């Protein structure tokens, strides 16, 4: 056979091999590209990932999101209220007081600890007992009540090292102008990062799941204090609301409501037709469930003015009431309480972010509190002005330094201005003075305004002016006009719109 004949027979085979090899190489290259993109994505910064997502939109999916709240009788909230009641008392008689007051409570016992620098002395025990009684712990059968609980105090003066770094205006040899400048540049009381968040899904710019959770337990407390219905209620309670969101991230319906409320042992075995404890417990649970559905939830709905939020209630939503079946033992007798353990309830219910610092018991020199309020003020006014539908603002401080070390903004891709988030952050820096002393001045944080914040959330509350009365064994009774929740005001909207050209 000649060479040409051999080649003629081999060529089709070689051509087939070349095609297979080419297919293999194309497949290998595709797998390599996928692996490389995955690796690059993992190494991208959050901002780069945001840009990648924006440039290559992926199909969204609906999801469920939950938030919880607790009542004023929850043991952790008892401690928050004690700490803030004491802080208010110090500020009422000395508005320059520096406080970091922690409280601890358990069966029949309260411990008050922390650091205070103030020229005034207050009666810690009287204020603590009054606060506990006002919450509703007034009966010995609760195993914790304001009249008989033991109270230990371990308050000492604030560290001189911290005070020296924070307040340089007290140094000797300063002129009046130097003293004024030093006071204006008061350093941050600690390092850390603080977050503020706002969303337009409710009228008060909170996540709807958290807003409804607060409303459930607050209304339950109102019913308990009125004493006309649900007479068996005790102070401790929790709620949780799960909301379904659609592909665009909009709330479409309530999926689940959970209510757990402490109650009297109001049905007991031994009465006619009830022979066992299990039967008594079953009847109690049935009664509480009926009352939650027929009394509590209708009262909650009457307080909602947004048709959009009312439309989330539906016939298919699940309502879980006291899922354990019985909740007689509760409050500090059931669980130990501690100041600062409900920071997600206090803020945004798991939306946005949290820097980890608690609020209650701290005066406004502590940026954990004051800067968290300021960033909420910024985020809420920015969303109300139309800059974005949703916004997270972060600031970070170094202890003893007045200006923040960083400012960060995230609009979650829901901005309405032709600016990057980093450019919006730069605008925030121009529009708002974020030094601690300036925050104190703008938000009027040297007022005795804090007890009202210690239950049912620090954010999304009503800004109003009230008169508060303070009395003490060591001072005459004092009436003070106080503006509450100043960080919820929408008084920067016009200024923001002008700055952003909206």
Label each region the model flagged:
Residues 388-390, 397-502:
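Internal helix-turn-beta structural module
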Residues 4-14:
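Positively charged N-terminal leader segments that act as targeting/secretion signals
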Residues 3, 19-23, 27, 31, ...:
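Short, positively charged and aromatic/hydrophobic N-terminal segments
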Residues 66, 137, 145-329, 460, ...:
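Glycine-rich, mobile lid/loop segments that gate access to catalytic sites or pores
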Residues 41-47, 51, 56-100:
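N-terminal, positively charged regions that mediate nucleic acid binding
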Residues 99-103, 108-169:
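Glycine-rich, N-terminal phosphate-binding loop and its surrounding beta-alpha-beta segment
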């Amino acid at each position: 056979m000649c060479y040409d004949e051999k080649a003629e027979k081999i060529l089709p085979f070689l051509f087939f091999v070349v095609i297979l090899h080419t297919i293999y190489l194309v497949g290998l290259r595709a797998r390599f590209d996928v692996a490389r993109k995955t690796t690059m994505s993992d190494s991208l910064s959050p901002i780069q990932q945001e840009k990648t997502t924006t440039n290559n939109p992926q199909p969204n999916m609906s999801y469920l999101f939950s938030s919880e709240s607790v009542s004023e009788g929850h043991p952790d909230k008892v401690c928050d209220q004690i700490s803030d009641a004491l802080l208010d008392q110090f500020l009422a008689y000395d508005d320059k007081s520096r406080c970091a007051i922690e409280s601890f409570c358990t069966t029949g016992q309260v411990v008050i600890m922390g650091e205070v620098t103030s020229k005034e002395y207050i009666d810690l025990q009287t204020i603590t007992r009054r606060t506990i009684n006002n919450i509703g712990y007034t009966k010995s059968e609760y195993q914790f009540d304001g009249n008989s609980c033991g109270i230990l105090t371990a308050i000492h003066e604030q560290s001189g090292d911290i005070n020296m770094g924070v307040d340089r205006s007290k140094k000797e040899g300063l002129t009046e102008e130097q003293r004024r400048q030093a006071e204006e540049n008061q350093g941050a009381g600690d390092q850390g990062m603080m977050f503020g968040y706002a969303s337009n899904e409710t009228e008060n710019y909170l996540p709807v799941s958290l807003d409804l959770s607060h409303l459930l337990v607050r209304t339950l407390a109102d019913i308990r204090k009125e004493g006309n219905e649900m007479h068996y209620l005790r102070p401790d309670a929790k709620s949780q609301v799960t909301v379904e969101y659609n592909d665009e991230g909009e709330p479409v319906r309530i999926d689940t409501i959970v209510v757990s409320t402490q109650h009297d042992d109001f049905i007991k075995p031994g009465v006619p037709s009830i022979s066992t404890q299990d039967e008594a417990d079953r009847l109690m649970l049935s009664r509480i469930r009926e009352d939650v559905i027929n009394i509590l939830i209708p009262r909650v709905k009457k307080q909602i003015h947004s048709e959009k939020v009312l439309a989330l209630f539906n016939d298919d939503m699940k309502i879980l009431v006291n899922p354990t079946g019985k909740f007689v033992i509760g409050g500090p007798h059931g669980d130990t309480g501690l100041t600062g353990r409900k920071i997600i309830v206090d803020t945004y219910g798991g939306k946005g972010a949290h820097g980890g610092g608690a609020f209650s018991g701290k005066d406004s020199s502590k940026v954990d509190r004051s800067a968290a309020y300021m960033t909420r003020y910024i985020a809420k006014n920015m969303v109300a002005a139309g800059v974005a539908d949703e916004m997270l603002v972060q600031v970070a401080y170094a202890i003893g330094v007045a200006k923040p070390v960083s400012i960060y903004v995230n609009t979650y891709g829901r901005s309405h201005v032709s600016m990057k988030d980093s450019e919006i952050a730069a605008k925030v820096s121009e529009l708002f003075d974020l030094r601690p002393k300036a925050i104190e001045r703008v938000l009027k944080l040297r007022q005795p305004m804090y007890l009202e914040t210690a239950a049912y959330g620090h954010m999304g509350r009503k800004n109003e002016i009230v008169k508060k009365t303070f009395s003490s064994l060591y001072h005459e009774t004092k009436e003070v006009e106080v503006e509450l929740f100043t960080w919820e005001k929408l008084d920067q909207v016009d200024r923001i719109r002008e700055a952003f050209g909206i």
